[in-house]
Curated annotation (Swiss-Prot):
GO terms for molecular function: RNA binding. Residues 387-460 are annotated as: Type E motif. This is Pentatricopeptide repeat-containing protein At5g43790. It comes from Arabidopsis thaliana. The keyword Cell inner membrane does not apply.
Length: 460
């Protein structure tokens, strides 16, 4: 199969990119066959690429009709499938890879251009993670070390990062002589989104080591970790860097800055960032409403929620969590109930346990404990520890011993190894002079082999 220069310049090839329907595509395909370009790699690769976006089954049929297709054509179709169909057609990408492996031609073998797309596909969903690990072994088997170029290495880093395997991702990253910006960003984002201990500290350390100029994605990871750590000064530095280097204050950078300033107690700075953003998505509104909620500005949070809707945006599941929470922190019970009821009735969003948790907190904080308890009994999902802990707090605040005891017993059932729950129960019993129950609680701790963490002081 050849690829002469004439095959690249024929006028019909310019029409391929303009095809918008399967009918147009078939007409161009017929013309390619008629003028004798059906055995040339370049026009076939363009045809495969576009047909995979218009009609994937037609693209696969084209490949089947090609006698002895080259690995370049296989790579083209694999890459296009992964780029245009995300996880929905991952099985087809791996099916094509299997065809490469089973080819009898000595010229059809996987190369350094085969694997990056497949590693990307492997990271889409947990069911494909084992395939990605197998691909790693194939890289070592089929590619010479000299062909382990930075694109393959970067794809490996991305795969393990997407799987949450930060140790493996970091080990592979350290072997890359000169990581490009995309690879740096991949690892930074993986650490920033991880719940592992010290992952945010790793983001700060990695950022200081960067050998390339950071962009907006780099700064989002840095600002997010600064927010989690309360690193206000470094977060402000990142904001200044964005402004001085004329980077875009897009939705991602803006949302991370709003979260940073809100968590550090600088709500006016957060609002200034929000107001200065030229484009705001639902996540931006959610971050700002969350900040207002935490600082007790529930009415302002509701106004922002209404503004979101008036702008033509559709609230998502997280929007209702932060907005009902804003109502809860400000005692706006009726408004919170109205917003909760609109979730399913207006927007078709089925409430989850976190929404019911906000509702229980809303009712409990206002002293409507009977309604909160009734809500727990009727909710269609199983209450979690966070919900029971909220109900416990409200019961203690309003002096309802019986409901507090119920909440704690449920907490013990969910977190029997948490010594704090036993201490709380013991304190409740001690507060009403039920010393026999205090002793029983301590015996229960011994039976479950739960040790109370000793108190410490940081004062010298």
């Amino acid at each position: 199969m050849t690829s002469p220069s004439t095959s690249k310049n024929h006028r019909c090839l310019n029409l391929i990119s303009k095809c918008k329907s399967l009918q147009n595509l078939k007409q161009i395909h017929a013309q390619i066959i008629t003028i004798g370009l059906s055995h040339h790699t370049y026009p076939l690769s363009k045809l495969l690429h576009l047909s995979s976006t218009v009609c994937l089954s037609y693209a696969l049929s084209i490949l089947r009709q090609i006698p002895n297709p080259s690995v370049f054509l296989y790579n083209t179709l694999i890459s296009s499938i992964v780029s245009n169909h995300n996880s929905t057609q991952t099985h087809l990408a791996f099916s094509l890879y299997d065809q490469i492996l089973s080819s009898r031609s000595n010229f059809v073998r996987p190369n350094e251009f085969t694997y990056p797309s497949l590693f990307k596909a492997s990271g889409f969903d947990a069911q494909w993670h084992r395939h990605g690990r197998a691909l790693h072994a194939h890289v070592l088997k089929f590619l010479e070390p000299v062909n382990h170029d930075r694109f393959v290495q970067a794809a490996l880093v991305g795969f393990y990062a997407n799987c949450g395997k930060l140790r493996e991702a970091r080990s592979l990253f350290e072997r890359i002589r000169e990581p490009d910006l995309a690879t740096w960003n991949t690892l930074l984002a993986a650490y920033a989104n991880s719940e592992e201990i010290d992952s945010d500290e790793e983001v700060l350390l990695l950022f200081m080591r960067m050998q390339v100029r950071p962009n907006e994605l780099s700064l989002v990871a840095l600002i997010k970790s600064c927010a989690n750590l309360g690193e206000f000064v470094r977060g402000v530095w990142a904001h200044v860097y964005v402004l001085k280097n004329n980077l875009t204050l897009n939705q991602f950078v803006g949302t991370s800055l709003i979260d940073l300033y809100s968590k550090c107690g600088c709500l006016s700075f957060a609002r200034k960032v929000f107001d200065e953003m030229s484009q705001r998505d639902v996540s931006c509104y959610n971050a700002m409403i969350r900040g207002l909620a935490v600082h007790g500005f529930g009415q302002e949070g509701i106004e922002l929620y209404k503004s979101l809707i008036s702008q033509g945006l559709v609230p998502d599941s997280a929007t209702f969590v932060v907005t009902i929470s804003a109502c809860s922190h400000s005692g706006l019970v009726d408004e919170g109930l109205q917003i909760f009821n609109s979730m399913k009735a207006v927007y078709g969003i089925e409430p989850k346990v976190e929404h019911y948790g906000c509702l229980v907190d809303l009712l409990g904080r206002s002293g409507r404990l009977e309604e909160a308890e009734e809500c727990i009994k009727k909710m269609p999902v199983k209450p979690n520890a966070t919900l029971w802990r909220s109900f416990l707090g409200s019961s203690q605040t309003h002096g309802d011993f019986e409901r507090g005891e119920i909440a704690l017993k449920h907490l013990l059932g969910l977190e029997f190894e948490n010594s704090g729950n036993y201490v709380l129960l013991s304190n409740i019993y001690a507060g009403v002079n039920r010393w026999t129950d205090v002793e029983k609680t301590r015996e229960l701790m011994k039976d479950h082999r739960v040790n109370k963490s000793p108190g410490i002081s940081t004062l010298n």
